[in-house]
Design a protein with these regions (language model features):
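Structured, non-membrane catalytic/scaffold regions adjacent to prosthetic-group chemistry
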Residues: 9-390
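N-terminal export signals
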Residues: 1-10
């Protein structure tokens, strides 16, 4: 034993290659480690055109509340336009006393406001409305939601400068992409907390997020936060555009379609462990996930490991912010038996996340918007985790 110890003490230390030579030079803009290249958005393109579709945030690979800009979900109706900011203008007109035009540079001179908000596509989670559960990752199923620090000019400041007519009650926003997305917003909301967003997480918003400027409507369905914003019309009635009649409406059981379901309901999802993951062995695991609500802040998240028979309250990461993603955590002792993991969120307005069955009862089977039902992951005895319905 003594000779072995002596040999170990005299053996040369083996250094890994990265400790024996200089590393990469300085760079103008940082990028993720090449070993993390698999952490990426998942694209879902339309069969009609590669420019129509969405890409989802890999929720299962992230921690904290902020989504990196390069992983923030995308949703486009006609691809990402290549806009020259020097030629781009925002026009405010209609029922105003003083029509206005703003260049990008002129808006950058206004006082800025920064807020942490989630953004969620109204179609997020539509795959969980399929008849049979899809075996896919958390991000693929639920990743049309992201959270950022948004910085820009309060819309109320610009509208006050334009002077609103007394009979006006709506604001109609139009994007400068080829689809010319048009959405109507009640003036009361526009004068409350809406931003003309110019920055995301400290840097200028990226093209897929609306460069050089986008409308940002906190807590409301993502499509009203019109990207590539170039026109705001103050009016006495909504535009009744295609995106307010043929799409982005909720199909009801009696065959009617309900318009203007703006606010995103309270929702939560366990991100780890989640779909397509594998638990190595029985033992203690941390069940972690995110919760959010367009009605306010998250007040409570409960977690179940037995398919909803019993619930335990999870810890919420501070600070808990209004209309912002909140991360929750709770330890779980897995005994190796099959389990069903679920989370249920309650917001500051008293709204409780419904079950999948409760959500489906409200709407027609063909409805694909505003799904906020409780989500479930099944854990097999082998440790494999998959999407299940409860």
């Amino acid at each position: 034993m003594a000779s072995a110890q002596a040999a170990a003490e005299t053996s040369p230390i083996a250094f890994p290659e990265w400790m024996t030579r200089p590393g990469a030079p300085l760079s103008g803009y940082g990028t993720p480690a090449q070993q993390e290249s698999a952490v990426a958005r998942s694209p879902m393109s339309s069969p009609l055109s590669p420019t129509i579709g969405a890409s989802t945030t890999p929720l299962e690979s992230l921690q904290g509340r902020i989504t990196p800009n390069g992983l923030h979900f995308e949703r486009h109706h006609s691809g990402v336009p290549n806009i020259d900011p020097a030629q781009h203008e925002l026009k405010i007109h209609g029922a105003v006393r003083r029509p206005l035009k703003f260049s990008v540079d002129s808006l950058l001179r206004y006082p800025m406001t920064s807020k942490f908000y989630f953004l969620e596509c109204s179609g997020n989670g539509f795959l969980n409305l399929l008849d049979n559960p899809l075996d896919a990752s958390c991000g693929t199923l639920n990743g049309l939601v992201s959270c950022s620090e948004w910085t820009g000019v309060r819309l109320s400041l610009l509208l006050e400068e334009a002077g609103i007519d007394a009979d006006a009650s709506w604001l109609i926003a139009e994007g400068a992409d080829a689809a010319s997305l048009v959405r109507s917003i009640p003036l009361e909301k526009a004068l409350d907390d809406v931003l003309i967003a110019l920055y995301q997480n400290g840097e200028r918003i990226r093209p897929e997020q609306g460069y050089p400027m986008r409308l940002f409507v906190p807590g409301w369905e993502g499509n009203v936060s019109v990207k590539w914003l170039h026109r705001l019309k103050v009016a006495s009635s909504p535009a009744q555009s295609r995106s307010e009649t043929a799409t982005y409406t909720d199909l009801m059981p009696d065959g009617r379609a309900e318009q203007f379901t703006f606010t995103m309901g309270v929702k939560s999802v366990i991100t780890h462990p989640s779909g397509t993951m594998n638990l190595a062995a029985p033992g203690i695991y941390e069940l972690a996930g995110i919760a959010w609500s367009g009605h306010g802040a998250i007040a409570r998240v409960e977690v179940s490991a037995d398919g909803g028979k019993s619930w335990a309250e999870a810890a919420l990461d501070a600070p808990v912010i209004d209309k912002c993603v909140c991360r929750f955590r709770i330890p779980w002792q897995w005994d190796g038996a099959p389990a069903t993991l679920m989370s249920r969120a309650t917001d500051s307005a008293g709204n409780v996340q419904p079950t999948r069955a409760e959500f489906q009862k409200r709407y027609s089977p063909g409805n694909m918007y505003h799904f906020n039902g409780i989500l479930a992951w099944g854990v097999e005895a082998s440790g494999r985790v998959s999407n299940v319905y409860v």
